[in-house]
Amino acid sequence: MELHIWPSDFGLPTIDVSSLQFLACSKMCASPVRVVQSARPWRSPNGELPMVAQIDGNAKPVTDFEKFVDILKKCGQDVVIDADLTTIERAQLDAFSCYLHHNLYPAVLHTFWADDLNYNTVTQYWYASHLHFPYNLYYLEKRKKKALRMLGGKNDTEILKDAFMALNTLSTKLGDNKFFCGNKPTSLDALVFGYLAPLLRVPLPNDRLQVQLSACPNLVRFVETVSSIYLPLSEDELKRQQSNRKMWQSRISKAKADKEAAKTTEEAAEAIPDEPPMRDAILFTIGALVLSVAFAIHTGLIQVSVEEEIAE
């Protein structure tokens, strides 16, 4: 099998949520899958990455996480993902996966694709630099519209409220455990890692969700544990990412400075006192009276007679 994922950056083997979930799951069960870093989503049946290409046979490429987990269970490797879960634990895993998809995933989409400052500073620049022109324009527009459709018009406050609650729920479930179902990783751990790792590692000018995640030390520890055990970066990847760090720091700093400048300008504009309301009312009344009299004279409602004085 070949697993095609987006390239690595920001201390991660890939910055894409779904790519991280596929990759983490394959590594947790020591699957002999061949990982291919790619920036060619058009080769996938749905035009997105990740994609699992099964080299032997004529099987269609897989782009669905649950189908990929099923494939891993049947591959015959020594470590079988989710093999030790009871029926109740499997049901809980499914319920938790659904809960995260509806409460945490929208916030991740909003953070990277709907927040204009984050999108213009990080997301758009990263994908545009990895895709060739003019395909990058088409892909970014398509991906952004898809994200907005999935958000369904929810306002920022509602999205963040659901996400904060989801993070607190995750933190409570993890507790002091190494993984979410004890000391052995499951597909739920891969799923959660894919959601949390980009939020924790990718620098963003609007970082409200990052701040909330950082306030949950056990979730931060979980991300670091999975990264160090299952997804360590090669020396070449570390060097390449290090060379880009200053550029990203500069972009983030400039975006934050522009944000503060815009906020200061807005506050200054709001501080300018409005015209006195009494004066406006008086001027409006006088103007209305003048117009009314002029209209009445013009239509003949008021007649003005002029008498000439006869000289004796």
Swiss-Prot record:
Q: Which SUPFAM superfamilies match?
A: GST C-terminal domain-like (SSF47616)
Keyword Transmembrane helix set for record = yes
Task: Give the CC-aspect GO terms.
Answer: cytoplasm; SAM complex
Q: Which keywords, in A-to-Z order, does the entry hold?
A: Membrane, Mitochondrion, Mitochondrion outer membrane, Protein transport, Transmembrane, Transmembrane helix, Transport
Annotated TM spans: 282-302
What is the predominant subcellular site recorded for this chain?
A: mitochondrion
Output the GO biological process annotations, alphabetical, semicolon-separated: mitochondrion organization; protein transport
Subcellular localization, per the record? Mitochondrion outer membrane
Please tell me whether the keyword Membrane is annotated for this protein.
yes
Task: Describe the subunit structure.
Answer: Associates with the mitochondrial contact site and cristae organizing system (MICOS) complex (also known as MINOS or MitOS complex).
Q: What does this protein's UniProt record list under function? A: Involved in transport of proteins into the mitochondrion. Essential for embryonic development.
Say which family it is in: Belongs to the metaxin family.
By what name is this protein known?
Metaxin-1 homolog
